[in-house]
Amino acid sequence: MLLFGLLVAGVADGCDLVPRHLRGRRASGSAGAAASPSAAAAGERQALLTDPCMSLSPPCFTEEDRFSLEALQTIHKQMDDDKDGGIEVDESDEFIREDMKYKDATNKHSHLHREDKHITVEDLWKQWKTSEVHNWTLEDTLQWLIEFVELPQYEKNFRDNNVKGTTLPRIAVHETSFMISQLKISDRSHRQKLQLKALDVVLFGPLTRPPHNWMKDFILTISIVIGVGGCWFAYTQNKTSKEHVAKMMKDLESLQTAEQSLMDLQERLEKAQEENRTVAVEKQNLERKMMDEINYAKEEACRLRELREGAECELSRRQYAEQELEQVRMALKKAEKEFELRSSWSVPDALQKWLQLTHEVEVQYYNIKRQNAEMQLAIAKDEAEKIKKKRSTVFGTLHVAHSSSLDEVDHKILEAKKALSELTTCLRERLFRWQQIEKICGFQIAHNSGLPSLTSSLYSDHSWVVMPRVSIPPYPIAGGVDDLDEDTPPIVPQFPGTVAKPAGSLARSSSLCRSRRSIVPSSPQSQRAQLPAHAPLAAHPRHPHHPQHPQHSLPSPDPDILSVSSCPALYRNEEEEEAIYFTAEKQWEVPDTASECDSLNSSSGRKPSPPSSLEMYQTLSSRKISRDELSLEDSSRGESPVTADVSRGSPECVGLTETKSMIFSPASRVYNGILEKSCSMHQLSSGIPVPHPRHTSCSSAGNDSKPVQEASNVSRVSSIPHDLCHNGEKSKKPSKIKSLFKKKSK
């Protein structure tokens, strides 16, 4: 087509068909040569000048070029708003943005104008003739229709009408007759879309696709994979964190339930203490009222006695005597009832204070446990609140999911829950135990004057350094006495002891319930001191020439109070020191009876202690007790040695001697950095109570001497020869403390 146009242009030049600016020159030059042209040639030249196709460069000769020129003229009119024959930059920009609906028209605008700021129809025609779209074939047009316009359903219509690149200007101006009748595009939206696409390629050239960038595709694929993986990981971590948080909330709820139960128990404890105080006040009122009635009965009896003495008539005296007797009987019945109430639990008055002191010390330990449990609870709540605050943000959720804080908080919550459950169990057990003790004893323990008052009243007679239990916990020492030989100071203090109760007080006591602290093994010297006058002194051949040193036994009332004694130590020779052995019979590990520290260290895996002599005596029946009394009475009348009394005693008495013959191993403890050793040192107490039947009637006055005899018999049974205590121990090796005591005596 281009070659054909050039040939036509050359023929036109040969036929004097030249442009207007050359045509004027040629006409002026040929005016003198040809003065009279023919009329036919002049008419033909005038027709060429009036035809617009011939006035353009390159000219148009075909019908398609004429249709294209008309379409371009229509487009030029649409773009030329001011009708000045040229398209300015503003007009083209407005047309591109409003009519063609392009938002970013920079590239299109520069491609249309290039260097020309004023575009005429001739410029538009030249641009179209030199465009690549003008030379499109049918296949190129169909490819443009399918790929860019995306209307493949009209491919057959384009092929039937042989739509090529030269036909696109007609489509660009939306020629209705051509698009509907020939191309058969009835859909208005399709016609509008096809018009815009055709106008785009006519004005701006063919659309070009950028080269396919495989690197971008690879990066995009990797990004998609990473994004999907990250979303899946975040989903799983969020799900896991939600499960952890749900579990943690469940633990918190259980923790709150335990805390509420603890508060309820504390309220019950306060109510019980208030009831105990009320009961104590009522009891005091009843006792006061009873004493008033008894005093009134006594006064009435005295008045009747005076009336009987002052009466002259024997009958009146008898009546007065009967009335007095009746009053005395009533007073006696009341006194017997009161005596039964008071004698049902015949314990020393100091026991109530000691039990109150024990209760207060236990309450202090409970308060420490409670403070620790509350501290653990507060820490767990703070950690849970921190995790809740962190989960409010996206990065906080990821941080919580990746870190181990959830496991740590879960562990802390479980520890706090465990501590609260242990505290609740301890509180219930303590309440029940002290209620049972108060019920059995019959006096108040939980309601007392306080720990300072009890301590000052109980330890006022001794020069002891009182240290509270709560401030410094005990530190148990692993190992036995042999491990402490190198750390033991060369001087072992001997504590002053309390004198055992006389036999009369033992006889009047009707209860066998005594504190374990009062049962302290007595020394052989104290046994010999309590022997009767007829007892042979040859029972101790190993100490013939040494004076009898009185030994004192001191029951430690408090295992955590360090006692400092000013009593001088006892001096023994080498023969006496050889008799000191620290052994234990069979598998029993007997703790020190003067210390209660074993109860604090019971979790270290110690074996249970053997039964004491008091527990042995409590298991006796009433018939065995009566048989023991008879045997002890018979032995007290005879002149046989002490060994005969032991042989004639009951098997329970033999068990008692075997129990008393055991040598207790010392229990070593470290308290506040100071080593405190409490050694038994053969300090066996002779004040073991012997059970005897309690007499409820006061009429039998002839039995007053019997308890005295029984007490003396008990002292005789307890004073067993020293050799019998060591028959089973001569083959055992002494410990290292023996050598230490030898060095001290030297």
UniProtKB/Swiss-Prot annotation:
Residue intervals on the Extracellular side: 15-218
| Pfam assignment, any one | SAM_2
Q: Which UniProt keywords apply?
A: Calcium, Calcium transport, Coiled coil, Endoplasmic reticulum, Glycoprotein, Ion transport, Membrane, Metal-binding, Phosphoprotein, Signal, Transmembrane, Transmembrane helix, Transport
- Stretches for region Disordered: 490-562, 592-651, 684-746
Main location per the UniProt record? endoplasmic reticulum
**Which PROSITE patterns does its entry note?**
SAM_DOMAIN (PS50105)
Q: Which residue spans adopt a coiled-coil conformation according to this UniProt entry?
A: 247-394
Biased composition regions of type Low complexity, renumbered to the chain:
527-539
- Listed Basic and acidic residues bias regions: 625-637, 723-732
According to its UniProt entry, the protein's GO biological process terms are:
activation of store-operated calcium channel activity; intracellular calcium ion homeostasis; positive regulation of calcium ion transport
List GO molecular-function terms, semicolon-separated: calcium channel regulator activity; calcium ion binding; store-operated calcium channel activity
Q: Where is the composition biased (Basic residues)?
A: 540-549, 733-746
Instruction: Give all residue intervals belonging to the EF-hand domain.
Output: 67-102
This protein's membrane topology, according to the annotation, is: Single-pass type I membrane protein
Q: Which residues bind Ca(2+)?
A: 80, 82, 84, 91
Signal peptide start and end residues: 1-14
Per UniProt, subunit arrangement is:
Oligomer with STIM1. Interacts with ORAI1.
Q: What does this protein do?
A: Plays a role in mediating store-operated Ca(2+) entry (SOCE), a Ca(2+) influx following depletion of intracellular Ca(2+) stores. Functions as a highly sensitive Ca(2+) sensor in the endoplasmic reticulum which activates both store-operated and store-independent Ca(2+)-influx. Regulates basal cytosolic and endoplasmic reticulum Ca(2+) concentrations. Upon mild variations of the endoplasmic reticulum Ca(2+) concentration, translocates from the endoplasmic reticulum to the plasma membrane where it probably activates the Ca(2+) release-activated Ca(2+) (CRAC) channels ORAI1, ORAI2 and ORAI3.
This one is known as Stromal interaction molecule 2
